Structures are given as C-alpha cells and as structure tokens.
Amino acid sequence: MEISACVKYVGVNDHQVDLFEGQYKVPNGMSYNSYVILDDKIAVMDTVDGFFTEEWLNNVEQVLDGKMPDYLVIQHMEPDHSASIPAFLKKYPKVTVVSTAKGFQFMEQFFPEFFADQGLPAEQRIVAANDGILELGQHSLHFVYAPMVHWPEVMMTYEATEKILFAADGFGKFGALDAEEEWADEARRYYIGIVGKYGPQVQAVLKKAAGLDIQTICSLHGPVLKENLGFYLKKYDKWSSYQPEESGVVIAYASVYGNTRNAAEYLADVLQEKGQKTVLYDLARCDKAKAVADAFRYDRLVLAGITYNGDLFPCMRSYIEGLTERNYQNRKVAIIENGTWAPMTGKLILGMFEKSKNLTFTETTVSIKSAMNEQNKGEIGKLAEELS
C-alpha cells in the first residue's frame, strides 16, 4: 500500500487470531501495521507480531528494493508491535533503533540478548526526546510522548512534510484491513476495551495534536485515515472525556431461569413505546466488550440482575468491573433486582459504583421476588418514565 510516494505500508493481516489480548473477540481478525519512510535516511516505523515476522520482513525488503534502513523507530513495545525487533536486527545489524528511554528498558526486558549487557551498542541507540526531531532528509520525525496511551513508553511521531501522524495504538480498531466494516463500532470497542481507562492521558495527546497540521493518521491497528479526520478526532475527544455519544438506553441483564430477562424485555418494550432507543444484552451470552462499549456509547444504563450466593451473579459482577475499571461516569443508571428470599442486587450494585464519578441513579429501583407481577410492571412503567 502506498500512502505517498515516500511513505509505504508494510504491515500484515492476521486472520488466525480469535481473541485479541486473550479476551477480545475479533471475528474479522487484526492488522499489525508498520510503515517505511524513504528518504536520504530510511526509517522503518515499528514491527509486527512474531507469528508474521517473515511476511513483514519480506514486505520491508520489497519496499527497500536493495537499500538498507537507517532507523527502526519503536513507538510502542507491546509484543504485537515489537516481537519482530530481534529478527530485524539480525537482518539489518547496522540499523539504529529509536525509542523512548522506557521503550529501551522494555526492550532489555523482552529481548535481553539484544539490548542488555553487551547487546546493541550505544551508538546504535537514539533515545527520542519529547518534542525531539530526527531529520531524514526531506522528511523529519517529530516525537511526541504519549505515556499510558496505553503503555508508559508510548510515543507518537509527526512527519511534517507529509503531515502524517504515526499514532501508535491511537485511532486503532479491531479487524484486518480487508474486512469490510465501518470504522466506528470496532474502533469504539477497541478504544473502550484497551485504552478507555486512560482518558486524561488521551486528552493530553489530543491537545498536542490540535497544534499540528494533520492530513493522514497512521495507526498501528486498522486503516490509514485520510478523509474527514475531524470525525475521528471528535470521536476520540468524546470517548476520552467520558461523554455519551448518543441518546439511548442499554439494558444489561443476568438471568438464570428467565424471570429477570422477562423484566428487562418488558422495560425495553415500554421504553421503545416511548420512542427511546434501547439495546438489550444478555450478559451470560453476549460479547461483554461490546456491552461495555455500548454502555459508554449511550447515556443511560439499566442493570437487571439476580442475587446469587448472597452476591451478584458472576457475569453481572464482571460486567460492572469492566465499567468501573474504565472510569464509567456521566451517565444515568437504573437497577432492577431479583431474589426469591433476599434480594440484594441493588445494594451490591450501588456498592460497586461507590467510587464512580457523576453517576445519577434513578429514584425508582424495581425489586422483584421470584417473578415479575403486576405491581412490578407498574414500577417498571415508573422507571421508564424516569429514563425517558
């Protein structure tokens, strides 16, 4: 793929992976992106997952067309982007590696035979300074530290001539490049799942990016972004500031025998009759990452759960943990609890959100004993009024 006359894509698609990072379902695979900048000095931007080292090296070799690379720039040390560093150094032993100080620390930890003790000599290492510049000829690389987006060593790189932001994992998405799907849904699921905890750090990077003339965004996952960049930047601003994108109600339920599900579905019907958009999730069976992402997408959330062994049902507890560890906030939340002899769900859910910011809980909490009755239906109607 040609990004410009001098900037080439050399990444790979992975259709073997079924769970990214061991937990996120990726039915359309993943891409691990890498780029080559051709100039008086040649820079290779990041590597790829170790399962695809040979394919990546072949891609790089084809673009180099007999030339030797001068720099290997490592923006992010997570193994899906760094695992091919050793093979690259074996093939191009004179290359200079460029990264942050923390990046080199992680290289020593991952690849001690190449970077610790008698490994890569000092003259083949450049510690990139924040706001530092590396001249390639007609192109220059301006390094921008982006700690905790989403690892501490991360930096992004701005190339001023082509006006390209090499964004590390920023603006990435699930899915291989040959997957035909819209960017937003899988980018949201990727962002909320992997980066979502670090909203303030993303906001800091967006402020830095606001001062740059960016015409292309090259992420380490997903497509190269060239058109309507304001759309992507606004999405990231919304996600990282924990503001809802849309008006709608997510109803997430945990049900053993179907009684709590019946209540959740009844509420969904009532809300839809009132013109409210609703999204229903069976937490025992759904893609939890999507259910978490949609809780951030919409402005209202209903949690309908049962008491189980004097506690929350496991999938409900896990779901709420997925929200709180990503700093869920600025939403309205409602609770439907069910228990045959001692409903405790409401109290337990409130306890899990004790440290959360700017959550508003509805005045009505629906408490069901075993199965929904006419009184409960009336309470659900009242709850629907509060949510509308």
Tell me the role of every PLM-derived stretch.
Residues M45-T47, P69-M77, V97-T100, L165-D169, ...:
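Active-site neighborhood of phospho(di)ester-bond hydrolases with catalytic His/Asp-centered motifs
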